[in-house]
C-alpha cells in the first residue's frame, strides 16, 4: 500500500464510480421539492437564490465528507469528539434524529404521497389516504430494515436511472415548451428583498450537509480500500470525485428551479414543492405522468428511508450498546416516522426549519474546523470556543424561526424584533456567523498562549506511549 500521497490517486473509472456513490448518497427524490419550490417563489430572482442554495445544498455536503478524511476522524462521533465527549453524543444524536425519524424519514413518505398519490384521489379523505399509504410505506421500510437484501441494490441501480430519465424528459419538455417566462414572474416573500440568503437557508432543507457528516466515513472507507490513506490524498480524491457529483447535482437543481420559476406564470402559489412538482408533471404528461411519477418516486424514497432507518438504528445501537438491540431501534424509528409523517409534508418542513437553523451553524463550523484544523493542530480549545460561541447564537436563530404564535406565547416577539434590528446578519438567519468568527479567534489566542504547555504535555504523552510499546516488545521477545 502506498504512503506517498502524491501517488495515491484514483483511476478515471474509480473516480466516476465514487462520484456515482456520492450522488446516490446525497440525492433523493425529496431533494427536488426544494429547488422547484424555491423557483416558484423566487421567480425572476431564481438564479440569485440558486447561488445561495448551491452553497448549502451542494458545496457543503462535499466539504463535509472531505473534512472527515482530512481530520483523520472515524466518522461524526470522532470529529465532534474534538469538541468534547458529551458534546459528541449530543450532536450525533441530534443530527441522526433530524436526518432520521423526526424529519427526513417521515418526509420520505410524504413526498411521494404529495407529489403523486394525493392528486389521484382529488384531495378527498386526505387524512385517511395518507394514513393508509404511510402505514404500508413504513411496514415495507421496516421489513427491509430488519431483513435487508440485494433487492435494495437492484432498486437503486434501476430506479436512479429511471427517475433521472423521467426528470430529463420533463426538463426537455419545459425547454421546448416553457410554461412562461421566468423574467416575467415577480418574486414573493423574502425572495423579493433577500433572494441570495433565502436561497442559502433553503438549502438547509436538503439536510445533505448533515448527512455528509453522518455518512462521510462510508466514502472515506471506500477510498482506503483503494489504497488512498494519506489525509491530503483523501481530500484531493474526494474533491475530484465530488466535483463530478456536484456538477450533476447543480445542473439538476438549475433546471428544476427554472421549471419552478416558469410554473409561476400559470399556477397559483402552492403550499410546498411537492404540489408544484405534481402540477408541472400533470401539465406536461397528464394523469399518466402522475402514475409513472408515483411509482418511481415512491420506490426511490422507499430506498432512501430504508437507508436512513438502518443507519440511524445502527448508530444508536453503537452509541448505547446496552440499551436495546438494533431491531428494536428499527421498530421504534419506523413507528415514530409513521406518526410524524401523518402531520403532512408542509407541517414537517415547517417544524424542521427551527431545528435546522440550530443544527446547521454547528455543522458548518465543525466541517470548516475539520478541514482547516491542521493549521492549529486540531487543538480542542479552538473547537470548543468556536462551538460554544456558535451554539449560543444558534439558539437565538432557532427561537427566531419558531412560529409567530409560539413566539407570542413565550413573550419573545419583541426580543427577536430587537435582535433583527440591531444584531448583524440576524435578520438574514446568519446571526451565528460573527460569533463563530469571534470563537475561532478566541480559541486561536488560547492555543497560542498555551502552546508551550501543550507541547510539553504532548511530548510526555508520546514518551509514555513509546515506553509502553518498548516494554510490550521486550515481553514478547522474552
PLM region descriptions:
Residues 147-158, 196, 219-248, 265-278, ...:
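Hydrophobic, small-residue-rich membrane helices and short re-entrant helix-turn-helix hairpins
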Residues 70-74, 137-159, 225-228, 338-351, ...:
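Membrane-water interface regions at transmembrane-helix termini and the short interhelical loops
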Residues 101, 105, 164-191, 209-210, ...:
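Hydrophobic alpha-helical segments and their helix-loop junctions in multi-pass secondary transporters
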Residues 144-174, 352-364, 383-393:
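Membrane-interface loop-to-helix entry segments
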Amino acid at each position: 500500500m502506498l504512503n506517498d500521497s502524491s501517488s495515491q490517486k484514483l483511476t478515471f473509472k474509480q473516480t466516476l464510480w465514487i462520484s456515482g456513490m456520492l450522488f446516490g448518497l446525497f440525492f433523493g427524490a425529496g431533494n427536488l421539492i426544494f429547488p422547484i419550490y424555491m423557483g416558484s417563489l423566487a421567480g425572476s430572482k431564481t438564479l440569485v437564490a440558486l447561488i445561495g442554495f448551491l452553497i448549502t445544498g451542494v458545496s457543503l455536503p462535499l466539504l463535509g465528507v472531505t473534512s472527515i478524511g482530512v481530520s483523520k476522524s472515524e466518522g461524526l462521533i470522532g470529529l465532534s469528539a474534538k469538541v468534547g465527549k458529551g458534546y459528541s453524543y449530543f450532536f450525533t444524536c441530534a443530527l441522526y434524529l433530524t436526518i432520521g425519524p423526526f424529519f427526513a424519514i417521515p418526509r420520505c413518505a410524504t413526498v411521494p404521497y404529495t407529489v403523486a398519490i394525493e392528486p389521484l384521489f382529488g384531495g378527498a379523505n386526505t387524512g385517511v389516504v395518507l394514513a393508509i399509504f404511510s402505514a404500508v410505506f413504513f411496514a415495507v421500510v421496516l421489513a427491509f430494515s430488519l431483513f435487508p437484501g440485494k433487492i435494495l441494490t437492484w432498486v437503486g441501480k434501476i430506479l436512479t436511472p429511471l427517475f433521472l430519465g423521467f426528470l430529463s424528459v420533463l426538463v426537455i419538455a419545459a425547454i421546448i415548451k416553457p410554461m412562461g417566462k421566468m423574467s416575467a414572474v415577480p418574486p414573493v416573500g423574502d425572495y423579493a428583498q433577500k433572494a441570495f440568503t433565502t436561497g442559502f437557508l433553503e438549502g438547509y432543507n436538503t439536510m445533505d450537509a448533515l448527512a455528509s457528516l453522518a455518512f462521510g466515513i462510508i466514502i472515506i472507507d471506500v477510498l482506503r480500500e483503494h489504497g488512498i490513506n494519506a489525509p491530503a490524498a483523501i481530500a484531493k480524491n474526494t474533491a475530484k470525485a465530488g466535483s463530478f457529483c456536484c456538477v450533476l447535482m447543480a445542473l439538476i437543481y438549475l433546471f428544476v428551479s427554472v421549471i419552478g420559476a416558469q410554473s409561476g406564470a400559470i399556477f397559483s402559489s402552492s403550499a410546498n414543492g411537492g404540489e408544484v412538482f405534481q402540477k408541472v408533471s400533470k401539465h406536461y404528461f397528464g394523469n399518466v405522468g402522475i402514475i409513472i411519477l408515483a411509482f418511481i418516486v415512491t420506490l426511490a424514497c422507499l430506498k432512501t428511508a430504508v437507508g436512513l432507518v438502518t443507519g440511524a438504528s445502527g448508530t444508536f445501537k453503537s452509541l448505547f450498546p446496552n440499551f436495546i438491540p438494533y431491531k428494536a431501534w428499527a421498530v421504534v424509528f419506523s413507528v415514530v416516522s409513521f406518526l410524524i409523517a401523518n402531520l403532512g409534508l408542509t407541517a414537517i418542513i415547517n417544524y424542521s426549519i427551527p431545528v435546522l437553523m440550530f443544527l446547521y451553524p454547528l455543522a458548518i463550523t465543525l466541517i470548516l474546523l475539520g478541514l482547516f484544523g491542521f493549521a492549529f493542530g486540531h487543538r480542542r480549545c479552538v473547537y470548543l470556543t468556536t462551538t460554544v460561541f456558535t451554539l449560543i447564537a444558534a439558539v437565538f436563530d432557532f427561537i427566531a424561526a419558531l412560529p409567530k404564535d409560539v413566539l407570542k406565547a413565550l413573550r419573545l416577539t419583541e426580543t427577536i424584533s430587537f435582535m433583527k434590528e440591531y444584531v448583524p446578519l440576524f435578520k438574514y438567519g446568519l446571526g451565528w456567523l460573527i460569533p463563530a468568527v469571534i470563537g475561532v479567534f478566541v480559541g486561536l489566542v488560547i492555543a497560542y498562549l498555551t502552546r508551550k504547555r501543550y507541547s510539553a504535555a504532548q511530548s510526555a504523552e508520546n514518551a509514555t506511549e513509546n515506553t509502553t510499546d518498548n516494554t510490550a516488545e521486550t515481553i514478547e521477545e522474552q
